[in-house]
UniProtKB/Swiss-Prot annotation:
GO terms for cellular component: cytoplasm. The keyword Cytoplasm applies. It is found in: Cytoplasm. Belongs to the UPF0291 family. Keywords: Cytoplasm. This is UPF0291 protein PEPE_0871. SUPFAM superfamilies: YnzC-like (SSF158221). It comes from Pediococcus pentosaceus (strain ATCC 25745 / CCUG 21536 / LMG 10740 / 183-1w).
Amino acid sequence: MADQEMQKLIKRINELAKKAKEEGLSDLEIIERKDLRQKYLKKFRESFRSQVEMMQIFDKEGKEVTPEKVKEVQRKKGLRDD
């Protein structure tokens, strides 16, 4: 569902970008564009943060080298038992 919402945001942002280049935007459209961009960035950051929090990193020898800060977040969310 979040993916569909992101696609809708991107589509509308692109429509407004095209219109801005071709003929310019009204004041309401400028406000809408700013709002859509903020919503997009918020959702992107949430998604990226979630991906990083779920990540475990291993070196070539198979030893986990996940940064301690990420491990702490994972522990707080109950994603780790160590």
